């Protein structure tokens, strides 16, 4: 049976629910993955779908976790966002359609020039040494 919205809210918490389901943004420099650089992968907190690797994470100083790319482009979708009087590109997870954050073209040039600015609340981190045990063994080769 599909999880209800209330069950989802209970499972992931209020902030993660607001971010992923209502396109909210957590306050800058408050997310647990902003200044966090352990080896592993980041998955959608709603569905567990694989999104980003620690290998592509960098310190941008923006106050949110920043990645140069998703593990695979097909794992995320991009959408025009004209909210708050700005023009941005929203990033959402493909499977769960969770709001993740935005992508900007001011990232490291040597890594493709993109900066995926992602809310910590939308992510769950899977440490390298737990990837196989938690069902993400197919992605261990990223770290070879």
UniProtKB/Swiss-Prot annotation:
<dbReference type="InterPro" id="IPR028427">
    <property type="entry name" value="Met_Sox_Rdtase_MsrB"/>
</dbReference>
<dbReference type="GO" id="GO:0030091">
    <property type="term" value="P:protein repair"/>
</dbReference>
<comment type="similarity">
    <text>Belongs to the MsrB Met sulfoxide reductase family.</text>
</comment>
<dbReference type="Pfam" id="PF01641">
    <property type="entry name" value="SelR"/>
</dbReference>
<dbReference type="GO" id="GO:0006979">
    <property type="term" value="P:response to oxidative stress"/>
</dbReference>
<dbReference type="InterPro" id="IPR002579">
    <property type="entry name" value="Met_Sox_Rdtase_MsrB_dom"/>
</dbReference>
<protein>
    <recommendedName>
        <fullName>Peptide methionine sulfoxide reductase MsrB</fullName>
        <ecNumber>1.8.4.12</ecNumber>
    </recommendedName>
</protein>
<feature type="domain" description="MsrB">
    <location>
        <begin position="5"/>
        <end position="128"/>
    </location>
</feature>
<dbReference type="GO" id="GO:0033743">
    <property type="term" value="F:peptide-methionine (R)-S-oxide reductase activity"/>
</dbReference>
<dbReference type="GO" id="GO:0005737">
    <property type="term" value="C:cytoplasm"/>
</dbReference>
<keyword id="KW-0560">Oxidoreductase</keyword>
<feature type="active site" description="Nucleophile">
    <location>
        <position position="117"/>
    </location>
</feature>
<dbReference type="InterPro" id="IPR011057">
    <property type="entry name" value="Mss4-like_sf"/>
</dbReference>
